[in-house]
Amino acid sequence: MKIDLNCDLGEGFGVWQMGDDAAMMQIATSVNIACGFHAGDPDIMHATVKLAKQNGVAIGAHPGFRDLHGFGRRPVPGITSAEIENLVAYQIGALQAVAALAGHKVTHVKAHGALSNVACEDDMTARAIASAIKAVDPSLVFVVLANSKLMLAGEAAGLPLAHEVFADRAYEDDGNLVSRKKPGAVLHDPNEIAERVLRMAQDGAVVSVTGKVIKMRTDTVCIHGDTKGAVEIARGVRRKLEASGITVAPFAGT
């Protein structure tokens, strides 16, 4: 059995840094790099790509709504399909150019924050993201929340998919993530999270906040770099998986 560990990195801005990218880069096998709209800038993007190349880690674009102040975690009411396509294509292209400068290659795309959350439940948003990815490069792997409208849009567009589960987030009974506004939405206990991820990988399922077992294909597990104790959590998850005979490797080539 093989599984990927992915992490959202490069989410600082200017002199401000978010999380310990250098440490996470030694644990993750794929990283999703902010492309300047919700976080990141050209220098941070370039430094993050170089760090990924040095560590043999696959890189992907992490496009979000243009909302630095809100870290891309606030929906944009009234945004059109064309506007979503444009902002996704723009951000993928930006990372592709920076990656070329650093001698690395973008292999996948994963939507960030509110853009992803809305797309998991809204057909128009999901289709617009998938359409933009396909137009830019149909070989890019689309990282999607398992069992979501993002997944259905990716399938309809004929894109290669990586089905994602979240190590440090709680799930509702319908398979969507519990809103960060609710208590208990983000998990922090490293041992609990490691055991949870092992069950996800072995059983192909997640357990909701009410105890409901939801079958989900698991190609990649996300550990958020901005979660408190992220490095310890990620290290514990990888150690638990490898100790159980599961190969931790990227879903796309580096």
Curated annotation (Swiss-Prot):
NCBIfam families: PRK05406.1-3, PRK05406.1-5. GO terms for molecular function: 5-oxoprolinase (ATP-hydrolyzing) activity; ATP binding. Catalyzes the cleavage of 5-oxoproline to form L-glutamate coupled to the hydrolysis of ATP to ADP and inorganic phosphate. It is an enzyme of class 3 (hydrolase). It catalyses: 5-oxo-L-proline + ATP + 2 H2O = L-glutamate + ADP + phosphate + H(+). The keyword Nucleotide-binding applies. Its EC number is 3.5.2.9. GO terms for biological process: carbohydrate metabolic process. Forms a complex composed of PxpA, PxpB and PxpC. Keywords: ATP-binding, Hydrolase, Nucleotide-binding. InterPro entries: Glyco_hydro/deAcase_b/a-brl, LamB/YcsF/PxpA-like. Transmembrane segments: none annotated. This is 5-oxoprolinase subunit A. The keyword Iron does not apply. Belongs to the LamB/PxpA family.
